Amino acid sequence: MDEFHRCGKEDSFWQQCFLYPLFFQEDLYAISHDHYLDVSSSSRPMEHLSSNDQLSFLTVKRLIGQIRQQNHSIVLFVNCDPNALADRKKSFYSESVLEALTLVLEVPFSIRSKYSVEGMNECKSFRSIHSIFPFLEDKFPHSNSILDARIPYSIHPEILVRTFRRWIRDAPSLHPLRSVLYDYRNSPENLQRSIIVVPRVNTRFFLFLLNYYVCECESILFSRLKRSSHSRSLSHGSFPQRTHFHRKIKHIIIFSRRNSLKSIWSLKDPKINYVRYGERPIIAIKGAHLLVKKCRYYLLIFRQFYFHLWSEPYRVCSHQLSKNCSSSPGYFLRVRMNPIFVRTKMLDELFIADLITNEMDPIVPIVPIIGLLAAEKFCDISGRPISKLSWTSLTDDDILDRFDQIWRNLFHYYSGSFDRDGLYRIKYILSLSCAKTLACKHKSTIRVVRKELGPELLKKSFSKEREFDSLPFSSKAAARSQRERIWHSDILQINPLANSWQKIQDLKIENLFDQ
């Protein structure tokens, strides 16, 4: 495999490489066999793991031969009866073949991703979910509209195989992939004409399909946007508005027309910014409403032309940042005006200038979060705290730790908001719900619980505030916390409550367009 990676540095070679012989490498199936046992051993009961789960390379070769035949289809996506030994062995070898197929297809995909990203400084990938917000703070205040483009998941298996054919010219290596996709589509759990590119049964296989599908969409979209941006020429050959010349010269490129002595001046378009978190791209645009409509129309036509997909209207939504709020991962995003007063003194005269700048203002969705807490039985629908009866069987330390963990995660995730008053309302709900839970467990009252525990009840709840007070210039921490935001870079996934609220928002939009 390492030798294959080294040989893949040449584009002309790895696009025409022969991947099908890799299916008959015993080392490949040894790797997939070990990976399958590691994953399945954590999910299957001990009685289902037997010493007979040994890999037979001869059986694997027979399965590959069955895949190549149209009349013999192996079942990869049906839940087999664990009591039937034959079904279990069949599922075992099917999973091994599926793991090997994923390993083979990951080779050209990893090489392509590595060499396509090189030289593109604007395409960066970060692990933290909060790495998106510094980019939004830099780009959003200069934009007036955003496009919330959601990636469609349903795609026909043959269209998905054709996208692989653009980069893999070894046709026999795609026959197993085609058989697997059609087998999944025709399974009793998924009787439909399209395949859903989301992780469901085999996590590694479907994660690979999702990553490849998103990468293919972005690569084609970026190339088209760059081509359209560089091909638009100005109606006049002179510079547009010579004011701020040094600023605008950075966004102007010159290229010569063939068989002509004249040069064409073209503007790089710095007004369209693209960012994606997970499977949800966001495009920030600065321009007239007609430009926003053209970009939205282009995205819809782009998906229909390249992937033969009919995108529903709600898949590409446009918002004006000055009037509406857009829902980002767990936040309401808007742009607010921030007035700044500048005093300039020249000799004996004093001038006061009033400047207005735009600033991104992320808002914490307090009311929806309280509704989610009510659904989890921490409070009622009006926000009144109640006891968590399902936790009364736990120890006191476990109850305190669970409530403390919920508050820590919320405060840690929403530390980037200016207004934290709503967070302290949620803190009040959680602390009082914790006291009521302990009182219900000990068949006592809240006053007795607070008297017995004392500061221990609220000690952990104030731990996050102490972290902010320990920052430099702690004497001004209280006033500074209302003006500054802290984006923590160690958050690798969205908060569960914020994720639930985001799914509810997406479902509301889908239901709105389905009516």
Curated annotation (Swiss-Prot):
Magnesium found in the keyword field: no
Cell location: Plastid, Chloroplast
Keywords from the UniProt entry: Chloroplast, mRNA processing, Plastid, RNA-binding, tRNA processing
Domain of life assignment: Eukaryota
Pfam entry (one): Intron_maturas2
Family: Belongs to the intron maturase 2 family. MatK subfamily.
Role description: Usually encoded in the trnK tRNA gene intron. Probably assists in splicing its own and other chloroplast group II introns.
HAMAP family assigned to the protein according to its UniProt record, in alphabetical order: MatK
Designated name of the protein: Maturase K
Organism per entry: Pinus halepensis
